[in-house]
Structure formats: structure tokens, C-alpha cells
């Protein structure tokens, strides 16, 4: 079988992704099981009947891969992930271990990972993310003893690395550093990474050094939020996330130097392998880098033995390496994008390049004379540009479905921006590597300065390009609407249909026309149908209220409380559609309404923060909290916020209580916080369509409404259920799910 590992690897990726992202749905398991059994039956029949033994063997291998990967995901989830979650989640633990990676710091917080060896006195190998809003008196790879209240970790990128728990420094956390350090190969790599970062910080201004650190080492936490937004809006975030592209550039540069020194293919293979492993370690063994590293090592080994490695087979083998023993690796969306982009480049870049060159009747024979030489090199440059374009287009088309589904947005200008930025990124990678390494070498550190200068100039060019293009209208398009998925589905079906058509030239033209028509018609209908959209979303956050008002062009938070364990889910849900928040309103500083504020501040750009509190001292302390300016007020206040053209939020502050009356075209919602007395609320606000509460307010009999929305835990809901039923016969709770209210549609 020519591409055994290709078949197994891609099957692993497909099955594991289907199981994980369907949240272990029973229907998905039924489909996968049926597919495996059917493949086995057909494969055995073909082998026995000798009609097509080769295809029969492929079907049997496919069936094995389907069954193994599904079973592997079930076993890993049940005996690895769930064991840790069931034993330690939402409990206070006492544990020992060591900080197993670098401590990541930002302006307002720091986080680090502890790998435990004992929990509650019992041997236990678990990884726990610790989040702190103050400095931690410990060093990377230092042994520690600690006490913490742990929560389930729901961040997919961390689940992919086996980090199933998290804890917060201020939530009963105590840590005692022993001073003893653990020495491993990875700890040595982290030391080199820290030294390289210090070199870049010493050589370059902050804006440029942080970009170099992001591009070279994948550390984008230090980047300014506006810079990250610019990269996100232009769809070029992959440039500041260490990936296979970065590894290829670095390794190609090293090989260029090595080949100048030796022609021995075994030495070249050794240098290649060393460079790949070193770069993987320094960048934290990111899945996309490991994918590229495995492929590169295979190609190098094949070359040393005078063989040509099959690209798809190599890619499949890399998938097997990454997922065979860690099926949760598919939780890293970056890894899936890496595999998808690479597959697109392998399958489509050459055909696209040939088609473009054929369209321009490209022929490039060198002719004598100056003019002939100039024309030759111009045509050669044109071919290089076509090659770069074909690679970018093929990668973009293959990651488009994943990007649209995972991030709910795409950038139409990503190909143009990436083509303009990639030459600068390549130069930046090489020069920042050289200057960061040379600067820490005694006696020759002065050689780092010219490379630092080039790195700074490249950083300036990249930042200018990305910032300029991010300001263009339609630099990014939201794809959370149904028409996008219809368009993707139609396009995929048209592409599959092309495999069975003889006259492909005519079919391609018709397919492109149909695809564009579906997209344009869908977008037009979406604009007409959603122009007046406005909804209120109340999240399942346990004890407290976190509610947003979402409009087509803006998002506002009317309360941001709840259990800290739900912070990641809430911020991730909002960030799928919005990068900034127009208004954040804190009804009072009780944790039930404010505990998740710091998470929102860290994740989003906040245009207006309004805090109601009569305590003058607390008001004065707020602005020093994280540098964000807040409008604080107390007393009896009354004002209206225009959240959109069709939705308003009327704020009524009476007797130390903030009421909020949210009004859409057809629906009104009254938000009443704890300890409120409804007799203080003006009578005209006592007849909302929906009442949002987290406890039963005083004088609730004064309210007349159609529906009561209770935000709180299941225990609280059951405790207050009969009292709530007296307000309205229709009662819904966030204890099991998020609740959405259509403010303009009823």
C-alpha cells in the first residue's frame, strides 16, 4: 500500500475531530461505528472475491484506523481526562510538584503550569494551570508545595497538552517554593528561550522586540492588544504563532549554511534533525511545529538514503505521531489548521501554479543580450510570485471551512496581506534568531547589532502593513450566519462533483459562478434579515449573573458576575463574534455581578465601563485596578444608554440599588439585583415582558411579567422555585444552559 500512513493519519484526524467537537455525541459514534463495520465487511468481501484486493486492503486499514481512533478517544477521555476531573475538580487539594514551563506574564496577570507528583498525599501525575494577578515567588522548574481550589479547565488548546485543571491565586491558593529545581532537556530549552527573549528586549524597542518574540518564539502575550487585533482583523494571526512555516524558514537557512561547509548527506541530515528538535523544544513543542518537524526529519532521512519521501504519507505519519497516544491533540485548532493548510498546499498548489502559467502562456528561455537577460529574470520573478500566490491560495481555501466554523470570521484580504508580509517575516525570523543568539555569546555579541537593526526595520514594515490593511472596510467578515455554511457545503459538493466530470474546463467555470452566486445572494439576504437584530444572552455561570446585549455591530455587558470557572467559556463565546465591548455595566461590586470583570478586561477592548457604588474609597481604587478608565457613580441616578439603533438600556438607581430596563422593538427585560425592593422602582417599569433575577426580590407581587429568567445554580433554583412561580407561571433557569432573548423579534 503506497500511502499507508497517509490513510491511517488522516482517518485518525477525521474521526478524533468528529468525536471531540461533537462533544462525544451518540449519533456521531453510531455513524463512525457503522462506517467502520461497513468498511471491514466490504474490504473482506473484495479480498476474498479477488475483485479488487488492493482497495479491499485499504478499506480494512481504514476500518482499523476508524475503530482504533474512536476507541482511543473514549479510553483517553474516560481513564485519563475524567479520572483527573472526577477526583480533583471543584475541590480543595494539597499537592506537590514543579513548575514545568515558563511563567507567562502580562500587564495584569501571570500564569504557569504545575506538574504534580502527589495530590492529597497520593501519587498523581496531573497538570494544573495557575492564574495569578500578582507576582509569584517561584521560578520555572522549581519544586513547589501548594494548596488550591481547582476547577475543570475548558480551554481546548490547554486540553490538547493534558492540562485538565486550573486554579486561581486569590481563591485560597497557597504556594511554598522549595528552592530545588528539576533539570530536564526541556528546562534547558526554556533557559535558552528566556535568554533569547532578554537579548531581543535589550536590542530592540518594546514594540519591535515583542513582535520578534511572537514571530520567533511564539510568545504573543506581550503584544499590545491593538497589534493582536490588527493581525486578527487581517487574518494573519498565523504569522505571530509559531508554525511549520517558521520551522521551514529557520531550517532552510541553517541548511543553506551547512551545505556551504559540507556535502556529506549524513552530516546534513544530522544538522537538520538537531535544528528541528532544538527549535521544537525552544518553542514549547507546539503541535503545528512538531507536525512540520516530523515531516522534515522524514524528508531529510529519505534524502540521506537517496530516496524521495511521499508528502501525503509524511503528513499522515505526523498525524499518527501526534494523536496515537494523545487523541486530545485535535483540541488544538492550530494543529488542525496546520494539517489542513499543508494538505491544500500538497494537493492544489502545483495545479493552481500550472493553470496560471498556462493562462499567461508562460515560457522562459534565456536569450542573448542585455534585454534578453532582463526579460528572463523578470519572467523568473513572475514565476516565483505565482508560486507564492498558489501556495497562499491553496492553503487559504483548505483552511476556510475550519476558520469559518471555529472563529466565525474570515478575512478576504488575508492572501494579499500575507504575500506582502511573508518576505519581511522570513527576514525577521532569520535576523532575530541570529541577533538573539549572538548577543548572548561572549566576545562576538557586537555582531548582533546589525541583525537587530534589520529585525527592527522588518518589524516596522510588518506592523505598518498589518495596521494599514486592518483599517480597510470589510477587512474581516463574520461567518456565524447560516448562509456561510450553506456556501461552504455547496462549494465542497461542487468540488467533489468535479472528480466525476469529463469536461472539467467548462465545469470549473460553472462551479465558480454557482459558488459566487450562492455567496452573494446569501450575504444580501443576511443583511436584509439581520439589520435590526438584537438579543440578550444570559450565561450559565453558577452563582451570579453574566448577561450581554448583542447587536449586529456591538456587544454590551449588563452584568459580569458568576463562578470564575466559567470565565473561559463565556469569554470564548463572546470573542467568536466580537473583539470589543461597547458598554460594561457593574450593577454593584458584589461578586455575583463583578467577579468576571478582570477576565473580560484581559480579553476585550472595553470602550466604556460603568460602575455603580456609593463607597467613595472603592470608586477611587477602581481606576488603579488595571489601568482602564471607569465611570463610577453613586446615589439616585437615572440615564439611558443607546446600545444600538433599536435597543436601549435604561438605568434606574434608587436606594443603593441599580435596576436596568432593557428595551428592544418588541420585548422588554427588567434586571433586578439581589436585595432590591421593588416598591422603590417607578411603576412604569413594573410590567416587563421578562424579569431577570438571581434571588426573589422584596415586594415581588408588584411585578407583572410573562417570563421569569433565573440566573443561578440548580440548587438555588430549586430552593426559590415556588416563590418564583408566584411572579409568573413561566420560569426558565440558566442552571443547565445559556438563555437567549430576542429583543426585536419577540
Where are these regions (language model features)?
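Low-complexity, intrinsically disordered, cysteine-poor segments enriched in small/polar
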Residues: 188-191, 195, 199-202, 373, ...
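Alpha-helical transmembrane segments of polytopic membrane proteins
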Residues: 28-39, 338, 418-425, 483-488
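Hydrophobic alpha-helical transmembrane segments in multi-pass membrane proteins
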Residues: 3, 226-414, 481-530
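Hydrophobic alpha-helical segments
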Residues: 1-22, 302, 420, 434-468
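Membrane-interface helix/helix-cap signal primarily in integral membrane proteins
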Residues: 67-238, 580, 630, 645-648
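Hydrophobic alpha-helical segments of membrane proteins
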Residues: 207, 211, 223, 289, ...
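Non-globular, low-confidence helical/coil segments that flank catalytic cores
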Residues: 98, 108-110, 115-122, 133-142, ...
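N-terminal leader/targeting segments
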Residues: 1-84, 291, 484, 499, ...
Amino acid at each position: 500500500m503506497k500511502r499507508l500512513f497517509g490513510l491511517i493519519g488522516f482517518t485518525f484526524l477525521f474521526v478524533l475531530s468528529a468525536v471531540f467537537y461533537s462533544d462525544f455525541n451518540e449519533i456521531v459514534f453510531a455513524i463512525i461505528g457503522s462506517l467502520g463495520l461497513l468498511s471491514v465487511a466490504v474490504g473482506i468481501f473484495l479480498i476474498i472475491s479477488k475483485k479488487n484486493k488492493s482497495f479491499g486492503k485499504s478499506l480494512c486499514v481504514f476500518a482499523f484506523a476508524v475503530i482504533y481512533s474512536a476507541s482511543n478517544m473514549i479510553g483517553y477521555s474516560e481513564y485519563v481526562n475524567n479520572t483527573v476531573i472526577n477526583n480533583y475538580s471543584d475541590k480543595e487539594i494539597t499537592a506537590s510538584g514543579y513548575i514545568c514551563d515558563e511563567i507567562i506574564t502580562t500587564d495584569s496577570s501571570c500564569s504557569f503550569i504545575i506538574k504534580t507528583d502527589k495530590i492529597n498525599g497520593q501519587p498523581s501525575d496531573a497538570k494544573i494551570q495557575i492564574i495569578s494577578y500578582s507576582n509569584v515567588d517561584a521560578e520555572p522548574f522549581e519544586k513547589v508545595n501548594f494548596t488550591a481550589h481547582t476547577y475543570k479547565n475548558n480551554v481546548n488548546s490547554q486540553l490538547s497538552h493534558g492540562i485538565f485543571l486550573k486554579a486561581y491565586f486569590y481563591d485560597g491558593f497557597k504556594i511554598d517554593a522549595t528552592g530545588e529545581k528539576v533539570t530536564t532537556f526541556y528546562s534547558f530549552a526554556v533557559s535558552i528561550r528566556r535568554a533569547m527573549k532578554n537579548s531581543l528586549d535589550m536590542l530592540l524597542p518594546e514594540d519591535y522586540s515583542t513582535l520578534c518574540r511572537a514571530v520567533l518564539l511564539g510568545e504573543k502575550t506581550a503584544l499590545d492588544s491593538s497589534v493582536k487585533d490588527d493581525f486578527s482583523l487581517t487574518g494573519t494571526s498565523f504569522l505571530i504563532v509559531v508554525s511549520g512555516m517558521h520551522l521551514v524558514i529557520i531550517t532552510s537557512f541553517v541548511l543553506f549554511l551547512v551545505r556551504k561547509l559540507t556535502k556529506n548527506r549524513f552530516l546534513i541530515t544530522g544538522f537538520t534533525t538537531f535544528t528541528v528538535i532544538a527549535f521544537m523544544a525552544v518553542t514549547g513543542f507546539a503541535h503545528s511545529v512538531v507536525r512540520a518537524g516530523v515531516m522534515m526529519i522524514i524528508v531529510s532521512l529519505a534524502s540521506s538514503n537517496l530516496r524521495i519521501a511521499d508528502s501525503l504519507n509524511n503528513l499522515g505519519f505526523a498525524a499518527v505521531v501526534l494523536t496515537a497516544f494523545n487523541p486530545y491533540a485535535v483540541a488544538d485548532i492550530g494543529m488542525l489548521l496546520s494539517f489542513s493548510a499543508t494538505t491544500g498546499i500538497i494537493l492544489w498548489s502545483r495545479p493552481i501554479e500550472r493553470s496560471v502559467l498556462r493562462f499567461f502562456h508562460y515560457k522562459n528561455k534565456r536569450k542573448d543580450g542585455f534585454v534578453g537577460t532582463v526579460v528572463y529574470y523578470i519572467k523568473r520573478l513572475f514565476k516565483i510570485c505565482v508560486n507564492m500566490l498558489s501556495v497562499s491560495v491553496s492553503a487559504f481555501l483548505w483552511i476556510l471551512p475550519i476558520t469559518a466554523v471555529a472563529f466565525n470570521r474570515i478575512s478576504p484580504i488575508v492572501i494579499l496581506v500575507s504575500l506582502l508580509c511573508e518576505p519581511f517575516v522570513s527576514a525577521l525570523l532569520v535576523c532575530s534568531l541570529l541577533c538573539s543568539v549572538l548577543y548572548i555569546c561572549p566576545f562576538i555579541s557586537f555582531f548582533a547589532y546589525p541583525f537587530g537593526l534589520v529585525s527592527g526595520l522588518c518589524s516596522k514594515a510588518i506592523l505598518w502593513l498589518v495596521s494599514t490593511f486592518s483599517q480597510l472596510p470589510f477587512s474581516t467578515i463574520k461567518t456565524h450566519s447560516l448562509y456561510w455554511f450553506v456556501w461552504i457545503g455547496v462549494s465542497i459538493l461542487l468540488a467533489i462533483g468535479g472528480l466525476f466530470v469529463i469536461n472539467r474546463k467548462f465545469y470549473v467555470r460553472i462551479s465558480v459562478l454557482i459558488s459566487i452566486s450562492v455567496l452573494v445572494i446569501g450575504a444580501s439576504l443576511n443583511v436584509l434579515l439581520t439589520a435590526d437584530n438584537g438579543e440578550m444572552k444570559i450565561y450559565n455561570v453558577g452563582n451570579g449573573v453574566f448577561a450581554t446585549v448583542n447587536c449586529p455591530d456591538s456587544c454590551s455587558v449588563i452584568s459580569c458576575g458568576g463562578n470564575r470557572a466559567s470565565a473561559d467559556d463565556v469569554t470564548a463565546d463572546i470573542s467568536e463574534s466580537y473583539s470589543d465591548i461597547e458598554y460594561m455595566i457593574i450593577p454593584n461590586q458584589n461578586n455575583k455581578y463583578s467577579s468576571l470583570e478582570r477576565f473580560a478586561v484581559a480579553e476585550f477592548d472595553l470602550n466604556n465601563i460603568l460602575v455603580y457604588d456609593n463607597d467613595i474609597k472603592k470608586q477611587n481604587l477602581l481606576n488603579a485596578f488595571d489601568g482602564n478608565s471607569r465611570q463610577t457613580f453613586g446615589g439616585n441616578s437615572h440615564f439611558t444608554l443607546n446600545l444600538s439603533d433599536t435597543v436601549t438600556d435604561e438605568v434606574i438607581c434608587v436606594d443603593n440599588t441599580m435596576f436596568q430596563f432593557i428595551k428592544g422593538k418588541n420585548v422588554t427585560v427588567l434586571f433586578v439585583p439581589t436585595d432590591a425592593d421593588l416598591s422603590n422602582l417607578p411603576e412604569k417599569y413594573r410590567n416587563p415582558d421578562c424579569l431577570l433575577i438571581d434571588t426573589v426580590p422584596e415586594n415581588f407581587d408588584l411585578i407583572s411579567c410573562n417570563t421569569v429568567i433565573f440566573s443561578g445554580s440548580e440548587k438555588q433554583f430549586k430552593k426559590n422555585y415556588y416563590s418564583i412561580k408566584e411572579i409568573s407561571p413561566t420560569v426558565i433557569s440558566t442552571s443547565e444552559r445559556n438563555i437567549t432573548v430576542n429583543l426585536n423579534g419577540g
